[in-house]
Amino acid sequence: MTASERELIKETVADFVEREIRPAAAEADETQTFPEDVWDGLAELDLTGLTVSEEYGGFDADQVTYSVINEELARGDLSVATALSVHCLATACIERFGTDEHKSEWLPEMVNGRPVGAFALSEPDAGSNPREMTTEARREGDEYVINGKKQWITNGKRAGVIVLFAKTDRDDPDSITQFLVPKGTDGLEVGKKEDKLGLRASDTTSLRFDGARIPEENRLTEVGSGLKAAFSILTGGRIAIASQAVGVAEAALRDAIEYADEREQFGKPIADHQAISHKLADMATDVRAARLLTRDAAEKNEDGVDPMAASMAKYFASETAVDVANEAVQVHGGYGYTKDFDVERYYRDAKITTIYEGTSEIQKEIISRHL
């Protein structure tokens, strides 16, 4: 894709963000309700098929374009961007590891926005170390019987299909395998929606499997290949989260600049006071550095998986989002501590980018191992 084509896509998404996403974000956050009409709009723009090839009607975005789109969406509402990126994780798994039958059955409809996809890897006692998962998919004849619990599942209630990671032998950490579990499967129970600090419009739930049965053909990967598959997918996922973190930081920066230009104290705009102007300069520099690091990781991932570049981007961009959102609240003073201004939401939303799809601490572990 050429730079001019990518810029046109960015402008199209940015226009949708301004018209549809940003106006709905505050209410969606307040009511903890996902804006389904926005999701339908994403589907109309073909964004629900970002990681799907053209063969199945998808957008087939390259890594840099995927990064640009994630940044723009998160600038409008991180909840929407997160829901889409997890849906795209699910479609990427089906595209990369599924059979032709899997792809034909699921991808064309998922490209059109329904069913929504979920990605079930984390568990209550197995977050940063998935090898400790206890969910088991035991083979019985031509079926797998699933027992266990998953935690922190984005799109948990909305999902029509779940990409599930489970051990075929609970005592064997090398037996982790990837499966497809459709909504409505007997023995699958979706837990209550988590009441979170931020990302409140995105539904995050637990999933409980109690003797849930799926046919053998719903196995996506070879037995024991699920974790390797997950890590290969999550490298791109971390770049998406880094991009979203840049989007949140950019939104906070823009709002801070606008407020500083309008708010007057001591007879002039606060932007003309060095204490504020230098703060804005630091924020702008950090946002640009995070964006460049993230785009570099995306370019490297286009040529082949580069875990260190992805982890550097995810670590730096997410910490930048937290810092810039914090400073944006500070620029707004007391007003920034109220829901009347979006920086309050950015401040709450930014924190999750340092946690999901690998904490900042895990990113530093990955970086240090590759030095």
Stretches found by the model and what they are:
Residues M1-G76, V80, F97-H102, E109, ...:
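Alpha-helical interface subdomain recognition
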Residues M110, D125-S128, W152-N155, K167-R170, ...:
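Short Gly/Pro-enriched turn/cap motifs at secondary-structure boundaries
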Residues L89-F97:
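Helix-loop "lid/cap" segments that line or gate small-molecule binding pockets
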